[in-house]
Structure formats: C-alpha cells, structure tokens
C-alpha cells in the first residue's frame, strides 16, 4: 500500500517535471535568440522543480510517518462509534420518553377517575349532610311546636285557674257585699235542705 502511494507520488512529480521541461523547450524554440540567459533560467527551473519534488516527497513521507490515513480511519471509527452511541442514546431516550408519556397519561387518567370519585362522594356527602340537617331542623321544629303547644296549654290552664280563682274571689266579695245576715241564713237553710233531699 505504501509502495503504491510512493510510486503514484513519484509519477506525478515526473509528469510535472516533464511538462515544465516541455514548456521551457517550446519557449526556447520560439524565442531563443531573444533570451541569452535561457540556459541559466532552465538550470534555475530544474533546481526549483527538484526542490518541489523533494518537498512533495518529504510531505508524503511525513504523512505516511504520521499515519494520517490510520489516524483518519481511527477518527472515523471513533466518530462512527460516537454516532452509533448517540443514535442508541437517542432511541433509549425516545423509548424512555414514550414510557414516561404513557405513565403520565395513565396517571392523568387515574387522577381524573379519583377526582370524579371524590366529586361524586362529595356530592353524596353534601346531600347526606343536607338531608340530616333537614331532618334535624324538622325534629327541632316539631319539638319547638310541641313545646310551644305545651306551654300554651299550660298557660291556658294557669289562666283558667287564675280566672277561676279571681271569679271566686270576685263572687265572694260581691256576695259578702250584697248578702245580708238574713240572706245568708236563708241560703244555708236551702243548701242543707237540698243536701238532705238528695240523701
């Protein structure tokens, strides 16, 4: 492989030298009389060409010594490996993302179900509390009405008793004022005769 590259490089250098020599030969044929120093120019050109060929040969040797192709191959291999790792990491990340997205969707669904259950239970609890409050209010109202009715009955009984007491007192006062001693004896006698007749 190295020998083939060296032969190729040497062939390129020889072709460049040949083309340069051909160019100078043509120029010398066309206007050789005008240039007295064409031999000196040719010698200068040859040294420059040799310098260039040596420079190319040294560059090729240095590149081979540095193993640029191997370095580039290693670099390419490293880049391919890194790229494969990046692709694998991307696929793993996409898989994880899909998994987490699925979990998040599932969690959202569960949250919605829990929220709906809590809302439904809250509504049922609200209805139960309202029903209990209505029952308690009805019981309190019934108790209040019963207490009020009892109080009214008690008040009526007390009023009747008081009215009867007052009526007796008033009647007694009127009787005491209006009845004379003879009337009293007459009434007692009538009462006694009624009692005797009944028995």
Swiss-Prot record:
Subunit structure: F-type ATPases have 2 components, F(1) - the catalytic core - and F(0) - the membrane proton channel. F(1) has five subunits: alpha(3), beta(3), gamma(1), delta(1), epsilon(1). F(0) has three main subunits: a(1), b(2) and c(10-14). The alpha and beta chains form an alternating ring which encloses part of the gamma chain. F(1) is attached to F(0) by a central stalk formed by the gamma and epsilon chains, while a peripheral stalk is formed by the delta and b chains.
Transmembrane segment boundaries: 5-25
UniProt KW Nucleus keyword: no
Organism: Citrifermentans bemidjiense (strain ATCC BAA-1014 / DSM 16622 / JCM 12645 / Bem)
Membrane topology, from the record: Single-pass membrane protein
Gene: atpF
GO cellular component, one term: plasma membrane
Stated name of the protein: ATP synthase subunit b
Known role: F(1)F(0) ATP synthase produces ATP from ADP in the presence of a proton or sodium gradient. F-type ATPases consist of two structural domains, F(1) containing the extramembraneous catalytic core and F(0) containing the membrane proton channel, linked together by a central stalk and a peripheral stalk. During catalysis, ATP synthesis in the catalytic domain of F(1) is coupled via a rotary mechanism of the central stalk subunits to proton translocation. Component of the F(0) channel, it forms part of the peripheral stalk, linking F(1) to F(0).
